[in-house]
């Protein structure tokens, strides 16, 4: 698959830098490449020069009157064109040093962005920053009735599970699993545990080691389990090979009817672990259906949680303070009064600090 390589080079010059001098000084570099020039001039807004090559590559040179100079180049992502672009950028950078006469305040050359490649390496963080992962292979890519399921291989993080474009868990992310289980502070031996979601098998694998009485995991998507038991074995071990074990069972069902059924039956758990979804980024809880789903899960979970039990869940990126505050407000609106604590954890593949919550019912007077 042919991909496009987008390279950038930025200069911040002193306010007295002359745009016309810079434009004329750089023209010869592009002309040497056989590129066709087109220049647009605005009296108060500087210059825009476009250079087009016969091989389909092109460059935009934008010179602002306050000293900002931006160069954007697009080319095919091939070795030959990549070397040509690097050479061109080097020449522009050297020429700019000559033209600016030491008035350059800042030079910024970012790694090129490859667009439209066979492997997508770019995934935004929860707070909207762009991250390029060191993905070198698509391990698994299938559409289930519920979502797109990708497992991609990272040189640093191992295989990464990505659900509908959202980075879920990598083989490196034991820190996530430990945090959503209480960070090693809980005694699971002889306890009844309910896991909501968790199709990667990480939580189930770790809890089974702690000799619980019974773990019930409710996962709606069989295809997530199928992909993870084959390609995420460093995370799940062999617990997903069978849907039933000595101390666990996996139900392939929607968790909401299951929670309602358990609540009606009066069934209770020592621990409920919600691994379904992060706190929504939206700050309109009355309008966003994800918030409605989250509130429903919270209320139903409290109904099946023992009075002295604990509810664990992920929050979101530590920078999303407004969304996290809204989540904490929702905790105050449940059918029963609760208290909570939170912990900030570094999950390797997330490349951002992540908040985890522990919720418990207030003691009865």
Curated annotation (Swiss-Prot):
Catalytic residues of the enzyme: 275
Coiled coil feature spans: none
Cited InterPro entries: PABS, PABS_CS, SAM-dependent_MTases_sf, Spermidine_synt_N, Spermidine_synt_N_sf, Spermine_synthase_animal, SpmSyn_N
Pathways involved: Amine and polyamine biosynthesis; spermine biosynthesis; spermine from spermidine: step 1/1
Modified residues (Phosphoserine): 57
A single MF term (Gene Ontology): spermine synthase activity
Annotated residues for binding of S-adenosyl 3-(methylsulfanyl)propylamine: 147, 219, 254-255
EC code: 2.5.1.22
Binding site for spermidine: 176, 200, 350, 352
Superkingdom of origin organism: Eukaryota
Domain PABS: 121-361
Modified residues (N-acetylalanine): 2
Domain writeup: Composed of 3 domains: the N-terminal domain has structural similarity to S-adenosylmethionine decarboxylase, the central domain is made up of four beta strands and the C-terminal domain is similar in structure to spermidine synthase. The N- and C-terminal domains are both required for activity.
Family under the similarity heading: Belongs to the spermidine/spermine synthase family.
Complexes and interactors: Homodimer. Dimerization is mediated through the N-terminal domain and seems to be required for activity as deletion of the N-terminal domain causes complete loss of activity.
Protein's name according to its UniProt entry: Spermine synthase
Protein species of origin: Bos taurus
Gene: SMS
């Amino acid at each position: 698959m042919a991909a496009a390589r987008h390279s950038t080079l930025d200069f911040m010059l002193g306010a007295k830098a002359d745009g016309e001098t810079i434009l004329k000084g750089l023209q010869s570099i592009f002309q040497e490449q056989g590129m066709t020039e087109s220049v647009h001039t605005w009296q108060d807004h500087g210059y825009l020069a476009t250079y087009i090559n016969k091989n389909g590559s092109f460059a935009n040179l934008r010179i602002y009157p306050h000293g900002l100079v931006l160069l954007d180049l697009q080319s095919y992502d091939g070795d030959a064109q990549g070397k040509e672009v690097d050479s061109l950028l080097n020449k522009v950078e050297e020429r700019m040093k000559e033209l600016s006469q030491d008035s350059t305040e800042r030079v910024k050359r970012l790694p090129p962005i490859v667009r439209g490649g066979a492997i997508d390496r770019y995934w935004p963080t929860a707070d909207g920053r762009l991250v390029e992962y060191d993905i070198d292979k698509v391990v698994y890519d299938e559409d289930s009735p519920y979502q797109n399921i990708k497992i991609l291989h990272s040189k640093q993080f191992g295989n990464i599970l990505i659900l509908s474009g959202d980075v879920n868990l990598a083989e490196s992310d034991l820190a996530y699993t430990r945090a959503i289980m209480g960070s090693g502070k809980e005694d699971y031996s002889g306890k009844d545990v309910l896991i909501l979601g968790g199709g990667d098998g990480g939580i189930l694998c770790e809890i089974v080691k702690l000799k619980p009485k019974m773990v019930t995991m409710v996962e709606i998507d069989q295809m997530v389990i199928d992909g993870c038991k084959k390609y995420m074995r460093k995370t799940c071990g062999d617990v997903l090979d069978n849907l039933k074990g000595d101390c666990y069972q996996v139900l392939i069902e929607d968790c909401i009817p299951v929670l309602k059924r358990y609540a009606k039956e009066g069934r209770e758990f020592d621990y409920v672990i919600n691994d379904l979804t992060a706190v929504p980024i939206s700050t309109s809880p009355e309008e966003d259906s994800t918030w409605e789903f989250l509130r429903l899960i919270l209320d139903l979970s409290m109904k099946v949680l023992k009075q002295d039990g604990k509810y664990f869940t992920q929050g979101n990126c530590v920078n999303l303070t407004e969304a996290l505050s809204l989540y904490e407000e929702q905790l105050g609106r449940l059918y029963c009064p609760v208290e909570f604590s939170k912990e900030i954890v570094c999950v390797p593949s997330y490349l951002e600090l992540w908040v985890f919550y522990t919720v418990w019912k207030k003691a009865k007077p």
